[in-house]
Amino acid sequence: MLYNEPSPLETRVLTRRFGMPNSASLDTYLATDGYQAFEKAAGMTPEQIIEEVKISNLRGRGGAGFPTGMKWSFVPRKSPLPKYIVVNADESEPGTCKDRLLMEYDPHQLIEGALIAGLAVDSHAGYIYIRGEYRYQIDIMDKAIAEAYAHGYLGKNIRGKRFDFELYTHTGAGAYECGEESALLESLEGKRGIPRIRPPFPAVVGAFQCPTVLNNVETYCAVPPIIRDGGAAFAALGVPKAGGTKLTCLTGHVNRPGVYELKLGFPVKTMIEEVGGGILDGKKLKAFIPGGSSCPVLTGAECEGLTMDYDSMAKAKSMLGSGGVVVMHEDTCMVKAALRIMRFYAHESCGWCIPCREGTSWLRKLLQRFHDGMGQRSDIALIGDLAKNMLGKTFCPLGDAAALPTISIVEKFYHEFEDHLHGRPCPYEEAGRLAPV
């Protein structure tokens, strides 16, 4: 997805350099307050840096929403082992495409965030694990890292601050599973990308069995403005328990899809109607995925009064997730939507856990049966039963990611499965108004 023109309703903190000439260059970054946060952080104690991040109420932007400052504080202060900073840039969630833009248009912001994290936990080496399909972004990050080394922002005795930090890119091989933090670490170490048993967690036993800070690209990019302008200023942009802005990938049946930076707590309806330019052809909102394909699906009615933040989504029994919003209008076949989602998860299951490996395969086959007009009434209950028996029974969240949207679609759009029973064609397709999903 190309970068879209900004909306006047955006609050551009992490994306403020987007659209500037040569925005990825070090010269542009330095001309717009770049690396000033690192200079400030270098004069702070590790405890002060972590406390500022805690004050900001920054929560992980990769999907889980765990408080970042708390996560950093779990890293042991004194350890005989080296500590590592790892950036999760393995962005593979359907509907999510924000991290690629942050790396493409402002790579030095990510580098500075990783540097400050290194100061906070006394780490001197970091890895950016980038999705293998992001060849262009990998080249941009490598160029930015080379610029940072050439101008003394990486390497030995950075800017005379008596702080050393080495940073490397590591390319993934296209596995969605490696977006899960422990599978990512296994892959980083050259092993098969499958999840680890936890505890211990990466903060104590992470990369190469050493203490590790592991966060998402957007999370690290939020750190420089937090340190530069203060945690309280960042916190004020959001809601009480979650500070700042969130990059939202607005996709689906809207007139103006794109990546937008919005304050946490932004109204869903305003996002769709004003930021996204409304629903295609003036149709009604039927279904809404708030944070990527792994989130429970909400109906149009459930979006009334809903805001884009962690607590609001939890009350609606969904998740903010990674911010991959998918809007579906009234001509969407929800059976087909469920099948598209399940095809992805069945393909991407690493096969390590039987409930996920077998469950996603069976769900895909059952949904395909309905899509082909061969479903039976008993199959509807079987789909729900299979999905519910996957919840909480796998080493990583992929099993839940496949089950949650399926359960919500079956429960909320039960009648559409009935419409596909006993050889009946899809009513939307038959009427010639089937929307693409």
Predicted segments — roles?
Residues M1-E52:
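Cofactor-/ligand-binding subdomain signature composed of acidic, glycine-rich
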Residues Y29-G34, N88-D99, P202-A207, C249-V254:
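Gly-rich Lys/Arg/Thr-decorated short loops/hinges at beta-loop-alpha junctions or inter-strand turns
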Residues Q36-E52, L81-K83, A89, K98-M103, ...:
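Ferredoxin-type iron-sulfur electron-transfer modules in oxidoreductases and energy-metabolism complexes
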Residues I55-F74, A117, G174-E186, G190-K191, ...:
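Conserved phosphate/anionic-ligand binding catalytic regions in large, soluble enzymes, centered on
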Residues A64, M70-W72, T96-D99, I138-K143, ...:
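Short acidic, glycine/serine/threonine-rich loops at helix termini
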Residues D106-A120:
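Histidine-anchored nucleotide/phosphate-binding helix
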Residues G113-A117, L264-G282:
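Short amphipathic, charge-patterned alpha-helical segments
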Residues I138-L264, G276:
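Hydrophobic alpha-helical positions that pack around
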